[in-house]
Amino acid sequence: MKIQLKACTAGDADELYAFECDNRRYFEQSIPSRGDDYYVPDIFRERHAALLEEQKHGSSVYFLIKNETGSILGRINLVDRNSIDKSAQLGYRIGQSHTGKGIAKEAVRLLIMHCQKFYIDKVEAKTTDGNFASQKILTHNGFRRVNKEEVVVLHGHRMMLIHYIWAR
């Protein structure tokens, strides 16, 4: 499947809201919930507008992962951009019906290609120790695991977060 990364805009709010609502339960199985308020339409739009302000000021870059017809398959972001050490944090999520098709692997590859345009030389990522698919996606795209781990609690279970770094 051919995908493309499209910069997030205000016009994406309604379709993105539907995507998030459709995938809420799936996402919350592997990452902490964004809370019930996030799924209230007006609050979602406010938060979306706030993210676009971050993007406008250069502290983050938000992309939608879309197919050839323009449907949202997922999201991918570079957040917490640091202009001094030219770094950012990677985050992504793929809708449940689109997993296992290589979309995340390709989206990360495409995003890495954008790094030079955003003056980013280092990208950091985290994933849980049990998320083997994400670990594979990161290593396939040139990320290396670093000896930094932290413990998080999700649904009452302790999990290790594994840190990865990609550098130009």
Predicted regions and their residues:
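Alpha-helix boundary/capping residues
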Residues: E20-N23, I31-R34, L51, N141
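Acyl-donor (CoA/ACP) binding surface of acyl/acetyltransferases
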Residues: M1-E15, C21-Y26, Y62-R168
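A short helix-loop-beta-strand connector motif used in the catalytic cores of GNAT acetyltransferases and
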Residues: D36, A49-F63
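Conserved GNAT-fold acetyl-CoA-binding loop/helix
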Residues: E28-A49
